[in-house]
Amino acid sequence: MTDIILKADHLKKVFISGKKSMTAVDDVSFELKQGECLGIVGESGSGKSTIAKMITHLESITEGQVFLKGKDITNARGKDLRETYQDIQMVFQMPMESFDPRCTLGDGIGESLRNMGISRTETRKRVENLLERCGLDSEYADRYPHQVSGGQCQRVAIARALAVSPEI
């Protein structure tokens, strides 16, 4: 299993509201090997985003397990969860909604770097470099989400995901 970097095993997600329940994901399994690309395809509302959110711990898992490099991360907490975030990043469909409107885009990109203990000066350098790699001028670091277009915000979201050099 050394070349498998991500494994989802019989994932299930049930949302409960009062006495009603709705199964969003039912028995999904897959493996992602080093160097592979994986596409999850389906109709609107079929559970694609929910699967990604379960893998990244943004949504709880009702049943099943997730393994990262052979380690069960299904119930990861604290330090283990922070390490997981360094290996797996997600770019949201609606990037504008994933940024704090009170913070600059540079703050949003640099948050994970600062959480890793990187100095503000070094964080700023990395943020500017990431923006340029994603086709935006470094001055976008000082803008707020409402000051950029949807496409520009998507590029900023990609820069944020790349900030910690994730494997996935």
Regions flagged by a language model, labelled:
Residues T56:
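Helix-to-loop junction immediately C-terminal to a conserved catalytic motif
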Residues G64-D72, T84:
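Conserved ABC transporter NBD signature motif
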Residues D72, T121-E139:
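Conserved ABC ATPase "signature" region
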Residues Y144-V148, Q152:
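Conserved ABC ATPase signature
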Residues I158:
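Hydrophobic anchor residue at the start of the ABC signature
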